[in-house]
A protein has these predicted regions:
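Intrinsically disordered, low-complexity activation-like regions
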Residues: 1-184
Length: 184
């Protein structure tokens, strides 16, 4: 029996793609609160592995990636919890890409299969994101993939996460942040 408090993949996709890019990548406290109110139980179920059956289809895998990779960045902005499901999202993304689920969907949906690679602090994952973006994305997707990869090449991690994750910034990282750094 399905838990009525949990969203379906279609509800996740309708909400996310109905909001559009102007909401996805900018700070909006009301949008963050709406995600938290509507999707927190769904996120918690996904993070506990209870929604793994969503991976059976391209649309389901996409919805699971949004729940694991995008929603926490909104729901838990400024907290270590924003990144808590990144490893799980990356595992889902790798499996979905191996099944060519990304190529079954058009842009911008396709790009969300690549963001868990882009959010990884592992250079191999970053290089895979650049490769996937060059093959299957648009110029904007490639630009952001390359920017993220360059930061990991330079620092081995994302300096803009240091304060939230309780990490001490190196002098080079602090200079980068002081110069405007990267807040994405």
């Amino acid at each position: 029996m399905a838990d009525a408090s949990l969203a379906t993949p279609a509800q996740v996709l309708d909400f996310w793609f109905g909001a559009g890019p102007e909401k996805w990548f900018s700070r909006d406290d009301a949008f963050d609160a709406a995600i938290r109110q509507r999707f927190l139980p769904t996120y918690e179920a996904a993070a506990a592995g209870r929604l793994n059956d969503w991976q059976a289809t391209s649309e389901g895998a996409l919805a699971l990636l949004i729940v694991l990779d995008q929603f926490p960045r909104n729901m838990f902005r400024g907290s270590p919890r924003a990144y808590a499901a990144d490893a799980l999202a990356l595992t889902v993304a790798k499996r979905a890409v191996a099944q060519n689920f990304d190529r079954q969907l058009d842009l911008p949906k396709r790009n969300f299969f690549y963001l868990p690679f882009q959010h990884s602090e592992n250079l191999v994952d970053q290089e895979r994101c650049v490769e996937l973006s060059r093959e299957n994305s648009d110029a904007e997707g490639v630009k952001w993939a390359e920017l993220h990869a360059d930061i990991i090449r330079r620092f081995g991690r994302f300096p803009h996460r240091n304060a939230v994750l309780g990490r001490v910034s190196t002098p080079e990282e602090q200079a980068f942040l002081d110069a405007g750094g990267f807040a994405g």
